[in-house]
Structure formats: structure tokens, C-alpha cells
């Protein structure tokens, strides 16, 4: 029986994880659930899964949850940053699902890694921001990090066993890998007229053709910044050079990514677009468990098509690839800027096409400094956010 902590329990990845747990109750126990402010959802899942601990990042939300939880459940409600870091490091915890969206997820994810836990990594921003520090922490602690993002999970499954055991320090060339092919659907605006993008609304941007996701990641998919962040994540997870990474647009989201080998072989992982599949794979690796997902029906799939990315349509993707080449400081700045600009778009403060423009401004103009520890990373993250907020104010 594995004791699990689910960070971001009230989000879409949290919900999918709890669904997989419910399919396999004899193997997994929810030890703790962690959320930010969503008391109603947390109350619902606490009653359903009865964790030992429910942690709310927001203190007022924690108090509200404590008042509403039935007393007979005997669930301890906690709050506070130190309490969260202690929770993921607790000796009773085996596995941590790291699914807090954005930079907010970095401290708790890194704490779980430093504690040597089995970390199911759905928070791509942790690697985008901390990169080498994250990999070094993983190697020093002996933590097992397994990629939950469908693309990185697909790549992981297509690699050799030796490479799977060397996450963060893979020798792709030695393993015969020529290229990692990172697939992406192109989002809801793949075929829209370029001139129409300026008027796209948040609701339109959040209508992904294949996946059901939260609003921030849905906008990132529409700009393809999500693929750019995944490009950076793949660079660190698989120790890949920019020459070894390629982005391929695959509108059907059936092939989740591919690995091309020196001998001409291409291995691909296919499946229905449902996050329960990679979650179940990570939870049970190297075994396999039920995910609750319907098997892929090849007779209904139809045509599979592939396109080269158009950087005029997706300037955020180009920015992310360039930032990856520049290094850790640039990717930290870009990630922070993007979180602010996407939220501004969702709040109706800027236009869809302003996201890339503001991100580029921040990347070009935020002063950087060496990143030697997590405090350095968070300081640069804050600096980039402040610059971006000012840029948005000037725009309006």
C-alpha cells in the first residue's frame, strides 16, 4: 500500500489522480490532500477519500474547511508554507503527485525531491525554473522522478530501461537516440486566420479540441507556450540538446510523443487523450494498473496527420525554444512573465496576441543574475513578474 500526497488536489490532475486511486484501492491510500482556496471541492474529496491530512495554502480557506468537515472523519486540517514542506517530507509518505500549477508548485515539489520521495511530476514549471538545481537535488537524494505530462511520459515509455533509470542524466546518443519528437495538437487556433487571433476571447482559447484542462494551461496550449515549456522540461528530464529536440504538430492528440533512433526506427506511444493514462503509468511504474480509460479504438481513430510548427502563428513557442538555448535565467524569466500575461488575458486586461509581445519584452528586459539556490530562483521569478505587471499597465 502506497501512501500518497496529492499537491493540487482540487485541480484537473488532482481529480484524475483520485480517479485512478479509486480504481486501485488495494494499492494506494490518500495520506494527504493539498489545495489553495477551493474549500467546496476539498470538502467533497475529503469526504470521499478520507485523508489523514487536508492542507489549505490559504489560511482562511483552512479555517472554513475545518468548520465544515464532519468531526467523525478526524481529518487534520493544516495551513502554512512550513507545514506543507514538512508534509511532503514526512516519513509516512511514499509518493507525491506534484500537480500545483505554476511557480507556486516549486518549493513543495523540490522539498519532496530533497526528501527522496517518489515524485510524479505534473508541475513542469519546477523544471523550467530550477533545471540543474532540480536534477542535482534528485541525484543527491535518490528521489525517483516520473514524468506525468502526457508527452514526457510517452517519451519515457519509448526509451530503453537504462535511460528510464537515468532520468536527468540520460546519454541519449549512447542509447542510439537521434531525436525526441515532442507532439502537440496546435490547440484551438491551429487553422484560424492569423488576422483573427487578436480578437480571440478567453473562452475561445480555453476550448481545447482534444483535452480537458484548467484555464491557464488551456491558454498555454492555444499559444503553444505549453509546448515550449514542455520543450524546456524535456531538455532537463532527458538531458537532451536542442539538436535532439523537435516539435511536431499532431492535431489528433493520439500519438503523445515519439523517439527516433539512429537506425531509422521511431517508437511512439499512443492512447486516448486522457491524463489518467500517464498518471496510472507513473503511479505503478514499472508495473501496470487499471486507469479507467477506454482502450484506443484504431478503427475509429481515422487519419493521423503531422505538421511543422508555424512560428508566426505560435511566437510563444519560438520564445521558449530560444530561452531554453539561452539558459536557466531566461527560462525562469519567461515562465514568470507568461504566468502574469496569461492571467491578464484571462482577466480581460490584454488581448490574446499581447501575450507573446509582453513575454518577449520581459525576456529581453528583465535583468538576470546567477541562480545558485531556490531563493535566487524565486527572487528572479518575482523580478520578472514585477516587470511584466508594469509592462501590462503601460500597455493599458
From Swiss-Prot:
Cofactors that this protein relies on:
Mg(2+); Mn(2+)
Record pathway:
Isoprenoid biosynthesis; isopentenyl diphosphate biosynthesis via DXP pathway; isopentenyl diphosphate from 1-deoxy-D-xylulose 5-phosphate: step 1/6
Origin: domain of life: Bacteria
Which transformation does this protein catalyse, written as a reaction?
2-C-methyl-D-erythritol 4-phosphate + NADP(+) = 1-deoxy-D-xylulose 5-phosphate + NADPH + H(+)
Positions binding Mn(2+) in this chain are 149, 151, 230
Q: What class of enzyme is it?
A: oxidoreductase
- Kindly list the positions annotated as binding NADPH: 10-13, 38, 123, 125, 214
GO function terms (MF aspect): 1-deoxy-D-xylulose-5-phosphate reductoisomerase activity; manganese ion binding; NADPH binding
The biological process GO terms on file are:
isopentenyl diphosphate biosynthetic process, methylerythritol 4-phosphate pathway involved in terpenoid biosynthetic process
State its Enzyme Commission number(s): 1.1.1.267
- List of residues binding 1-deoxy-D-xylulose 5-phosphate: 124, 150-151, 185, 208, 221, 226-227, 230
Supply the alphabetized keyword list: Isoprene biosynthesis, Manganese, Metal-binding, NADP, Oxidoreductase
Q: What does this protein do?
A: Catalyzes the NADPH-dependent rearrangement and reduction of 1-deoxy-D-xylulose-5-phosphate (DXP) to 2-C-methyl-D-erythritol 4-phosphate (MEP).
Return the PANTHER family for the record.
1-DEOXY-D-XYLULOSE 5-PHOSPHATE REDUCTOISOMERASE, 1-DEOXY-D-XYLULOSE 5-PHOSPHATE REDUCTOISOMERASE, CHLOROPLASTIC
According to its UniProt record, which protein family does this protein belong to? Answer: Belongs to the DXR family.
- Designated name of the protein: 1-deoxy-D-xylulose 5-phosphate reductoisomerase
Origin species, per record, is: Shewanella pealeana (strain ATCC 700345 / ANG-SQ1)
